[in-house]
């Protein structure tokens, strides 16, 4: 670049221009070499048969071109495939210059049907440069057999085809060319067919099968031929095809009867349907050409046609009308048998019928028209059928009358020899769907002849019946926790209609169950009526519901009806028992306490449990699963009460651990358990509450426990409020009458014994021990001046009282003279002293010396005893207004308080308490008359009763002395005595004694 741009180098220019003429001559020399003839450019031709194995030699290109490969050197030759055939069928050996087969050559695949198959190559040589064209011709060999397009050919040729008819056959194909292609065809020997070959084009021929003799299906119905194609190769190859020629029948034979004339005899009285003769004809053709149909030919007169008929398929000729010898003694019947070919062919015969004379022509009923079915809502006079009658006799015997059964809803209307059958009454398809109406035809001859004709009249349906369920209601019982989609029940409704009027579809009427549509619970298959559960049912949420199923038909208009399916959810044992009391947590057991002096059978506590299930699944059974002392405690199976089996002694431990299992009666059974710690102490008051047991986190309370706490708190508040209100009212009333009672404290009205004695009417005799101090917890006994046998008492109790027994000595009327034989009732020491060990200071003993000694007293029906009330009373007595307080003459050791209502003598003797009765010196006891107390005999009821105390009015009513049943001997609770006292108050007794009695009664009623 630098030299090209420097001009001063002019001295070197002559040396640069010297080689230029030689460079210009080189292209000219190369062009000259290419144009010169000789080994530089040549044309080579080779041929090789197809299907040669790879490596087969085609020719030596180097030798043909006169090239010496040793002088040229390696890589001086190269071959190119013109047209780039793929794959490369030929290759050149660069070391030897030989052209050989590289891959198998299939001429048919490479060149198909072309006459010549050539492969064009180009050989390039270097030093010197030479280009040679090479043509390799692929020679065909006979490697393919001729082949027909189909292996079998089916030809159908009618037997009526004339000889010379041609039938084209497809030619065979051979992929080879030239002499190796198909050259000739051969046909198997046949007397009916031959092969005709016509050239179409080079190496192609047209094949035709030529009929050279007529066909007869009756002789040969099928012909089998073999067509063979042969090529010109060596050895020759061939291919075959099967040709089946089926000969089609033509109606070329006419039917033929066994006889041309048949002769028979027939009685005149032959009824319709009598077989006259059975004809037989035959036809050698096949198919429809051989099927025969019998009929009366046109030569048969109408008279014969009315009397005789022939069965088209069997050829039986039968009588259809009445034969009359007087009219015709013989009949000629012409019968033809016709085949069913395209061009029917017929055969004929004649039947001669000779009538044997008898005189008995019966009328004939002919059904002209029948309009069946008849709709069930057809109106009267609707035409059902049109009938006609015929009698071959003459004169009076020809007159025919028709009749029906009177019970049918049809009647006949006649005009001449024709009758119409019409509707005369209501039709009901559901009751009768088809009527077989028998029409009786009677002629006027002597004797009368009759004939019957039965008409089958069908009644068509209309939609006049709604679907009806098989049951008014369906009861479905399904266990809870069912799987969704379970089949509940299949309801079924029937419709007496038919077809679409009887097709019933089912659906559920819309309604809500617990705020949700019914389809949220139940689904129904509209076609089958099967009810399925959509969801799982829970017995504890709802136990039963009902769905209304509507069944509707598909009539026009549609009719429907409804049915009810009651679904009852059956409880399963899916809830374990829940222990309400006592409750325990995982960290601590329930705590209970009991005194060490508790006897056998002592109630320690009671396990309360509940089960959300029902029925036997909710039956609970209590078991003692574990305890530290197996012999000390037992659990009641059904109540859950835990009691001691023996007395707790000093040898027992201080605490006992128990585990109580509550099990239900389900299958399988579920259970719950609670742990209980029982502490044994000397006194219950010393036991401190377990704060861990009673103080719980609010989260541990269940919803049920919360409801129980609210309910108990509400009840306790109402009860406390009621007690306060009653106490205020009572204090107000006592204050009004001079008696103080405040804040739940019951006091005694301060009166001296002398004052009380002055106001008494000597009906009550009461004695109190010396130095007895009246306590605020008292029993009040009142007596009335006017009603000396009516008393009331009041018991004011404290929470510390442990006695639950009250002894009351009843009074009775005097039944006879002499001293009373009444005695005190005997109670055991436990009843008198109570289980808490207190003395029997709560016992008041009433005495009446006028007690009947003859018979025991029956309980008054007015008495009602409440077991929930206890009369734990201390030894204090308040005798108000009608009582007498006085000391007995016996001194302190024998000063037993006595209450008497019948004996006015204060000097009567006193009886000490019975030995072993558990009554100490500070107790009240009965006062008896002189003498020892009388013991009750076996089976007798004592006149004295021990009755638990109750804050209610106790009335002792005295009946007259001659009364058989002394009702005053018993205690009465209720309002009868109060009603009597109110009536007496209305009578106007205004004395202070009656006022005080009325006030006392009102006070007791408030209690």
UniProtKB/Swiss-Prot annotation:
Domain Cadherin: 43-148, 149-257, 258-365, 374-469, 470-579, 594-691
Ranges facing Cytoplasmic side: 730-1007
Subcellular location: Cell membrane
Record's signal peptide: 1-42
Record's keyword terms, sorted: Calcium, Cell adhesion, Cell membrane, Glycoprotein, Membrane, Repeat, Signal, Transmembrane, Transmembrane helix
Compositional bias annotation for Basic and acidic residues: 966-980
Molecular function GO labels: calcium ion binding
The keyword Flavoprotein is annotated on this UniProt entry: no
Pfam families: Cadherin, Cadherin_2, Cadherin_C_2, Cadherin_tail
Region of interest (4 X 4 AA repeats of P-X-X-P), ranges: 856-951
Name recorded for this polypeptide: Protocadherin alpha-C2
């Amino acid at each position: 670049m630098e030299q090209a741009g420097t001009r001063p180098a002019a001295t070197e220019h002559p040396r640069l221009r010297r080689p230029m003429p030689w460079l210009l001559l080189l292209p000219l020399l190369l062009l000259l070499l290419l144009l010169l003839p000789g080994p530089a450019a040549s044309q080579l031709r080779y041929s090789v048969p197809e299907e040669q194995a790879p490596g087969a030699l085609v020719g030596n290109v180097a030798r043909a071109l006169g090239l010496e490969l040793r002088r040229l050197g390696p890589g001086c030759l190269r071959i190119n495939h013109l047209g780039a055939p793929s794959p490369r069928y030929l290759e050149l050996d660069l070391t030897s210059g030989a052209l050989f087969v590289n891959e198998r050559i299939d001429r048919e695949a490479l060149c198909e049907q072309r006459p010549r198959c050539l492969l064009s190559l180009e050989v390039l040589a270097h030093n010197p440069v030479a280009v040679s064209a090479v043509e390799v011709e692929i020679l065909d060999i006979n490697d393919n057999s001729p082949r027909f397009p189909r292996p079998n050919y089916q030809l159908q040729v009618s037997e009526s085809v004339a000889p010379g008819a041609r039938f084209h056959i497809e030619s065979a194909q051979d992929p080879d060319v030239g002499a190796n292609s198909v050259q000739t065809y051969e046909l198997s020997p046949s007397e009916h067919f031959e092969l005709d070959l016509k050239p179409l084009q080079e190496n192609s021929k047209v094949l035709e099968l030529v009929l050279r003799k007529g066909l007869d299906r009756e002789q040969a119905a099928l012909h089998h031929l073999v067509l063979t194609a042969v090529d010109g190769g060596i050895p020759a190859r061939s291919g075959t095809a099967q040709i089946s020629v089926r000969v089609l029948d033509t109606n070329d034979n006419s039917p033929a009867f066994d006889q041309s004339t048949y002769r028979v005899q027939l009685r005149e009285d032959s009824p319709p349907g009598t077989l006259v003769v059975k004809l037989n004809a035959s036809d050698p053709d096949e198919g429809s050409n051989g099927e025969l149909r019998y009929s009366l030919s046109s030569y048969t007169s109408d008279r014969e046609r009315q009397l005789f008929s022939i069965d088209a398929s069997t050829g039986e000729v039968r009588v259809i009308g009445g034969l009359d010898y007087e009219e015709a003694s013989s009949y000629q019947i012409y019968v033809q048998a016709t085949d069913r070919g395209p061009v029917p062919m017929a055969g004929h015969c004649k039947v001669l019928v000779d009538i044997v004379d008898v005189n008995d022509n019966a009328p004939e009923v002919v059904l002209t028209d029948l309009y069946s079915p008849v709709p069930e809502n057809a109106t009267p006079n609707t035409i059902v059928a049109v009938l006609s009658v015929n009698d071959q006799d003459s004169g009076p015997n020809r007159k025919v009358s028709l009749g029906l059964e009177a019970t049918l809803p049809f009647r006949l209307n006649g005009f001449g020899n024709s009758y119409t059958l019409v509707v005369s009454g209501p039709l009901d398809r559901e009751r009768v769907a088809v009527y077989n109406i028998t029409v009786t035809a009677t002629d006027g001859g002597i004797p009368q002849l009759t004939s019957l004709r039965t008409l089958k009249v069908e009644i068509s349906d209309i939609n006049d019946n709604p679907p009806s369920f098989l049951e008014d209601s369906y009861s479905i019982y399904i266990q809870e926790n069912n799987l969704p989609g379970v089949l509940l029940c299949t309801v079924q409704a029937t419709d007496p209609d038919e077809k679409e009027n009887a097709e019933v579809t089912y659906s559920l009427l819309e309604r809500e169950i617990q705020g949700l549509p019914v389809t949220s619970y139940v689904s129904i298959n509209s076609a089958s009526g099967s009810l399925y559960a959509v969801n799982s049912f829970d017995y504890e949420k709802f136990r039963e519901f009902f769905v209304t199923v509507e069944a509707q038909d598909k009539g026009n208009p549609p009719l429907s009806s409804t049915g009810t399916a009651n679904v009852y959810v059956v409880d399963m044992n899916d809830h374990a028992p829940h222990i309400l009391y006592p409750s325990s947590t995982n960290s601590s057991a329930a705590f209970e306490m009991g005194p060490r002096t508790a006897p056998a059978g002592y109630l320690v506590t009671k396990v309360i449990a509940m089960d959300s299930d029902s029925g036997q699944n909710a039956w609970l059974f209590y078991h003692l699963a574990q305890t530290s002392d197996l012999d000390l405690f037992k659990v009641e199976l059904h109540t859950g009460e835990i009691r001691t089996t023996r007395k707790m002694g000093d040898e027992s431990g201080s605490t006992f651990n128990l585990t109580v299992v509550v099990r239900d009666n389900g299958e399988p059974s579920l259970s719950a358990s609670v742990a209980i710690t029982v502490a044994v102490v000397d006194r219950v008051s010393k036991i401190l509450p377990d704060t861990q047991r009673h103080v719980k986190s609010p989260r541990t309370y269940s919803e049920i426990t919360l409801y129980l706490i609210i309910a108990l708190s509400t009840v306790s508040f109402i009860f406390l409020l009621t007690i306060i209100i009653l106490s205020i009212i009572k204090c107000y009333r006592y204050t009004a009458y001079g008696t103080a009672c405040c804040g739940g404290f019951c006091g005694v009205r301060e009166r001296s014994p002398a004052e009380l004695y002055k106001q008494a009417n000597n009906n009550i005799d009461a004695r109190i021990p010396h130095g007895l101090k009246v306590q605020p917890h008292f029993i009040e006994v009142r007596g009335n001046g006017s009603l000396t046998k009516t008393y009331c008492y009041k018991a004011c109790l404290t929470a510390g009282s442990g006695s639950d027994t009250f002894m009351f000595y009843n009074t009775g009327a005097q039944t006879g003279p002499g001293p009373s034989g009444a005695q005190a009732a005997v109670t055991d020491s436990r009843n008198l002293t109570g289980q808490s060990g207190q003395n029997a200071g709560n016992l008041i003993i009433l005495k009446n010396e006028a007690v009947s000694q003859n018979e025991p007293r029956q309980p008054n029906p007015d008495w009602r005893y409440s077991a929930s009330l206890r009369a734990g009373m201390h030894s204090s007595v308040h005798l108000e207004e009608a009582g007498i307080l006085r000391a007995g003459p016996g001194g302190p050791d024998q000063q037993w308080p006595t209450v008497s209502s019948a004996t006015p003598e204060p000097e009567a003797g006193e009886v000490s308490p019975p030995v072993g009765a558990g009554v100490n010196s500070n107790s009240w006891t009965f006062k008896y008359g002189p003498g020892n107390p009388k013991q009750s005999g076996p089976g007798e009821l004592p006149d004295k009763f021990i009755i638990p105390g109750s804050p209610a009015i106790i009335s002792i009513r005295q009946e007259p002395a001659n009364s058989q049943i002394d009702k005053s001997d018993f205690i009465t609770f209720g309002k009868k005595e109060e009603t009597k006292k109110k009536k007496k108050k209305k009578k106007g007794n205004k004395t202070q004694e009656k006022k005080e009695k009325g006030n006392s009664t009102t006070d007791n009623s408030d209690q």
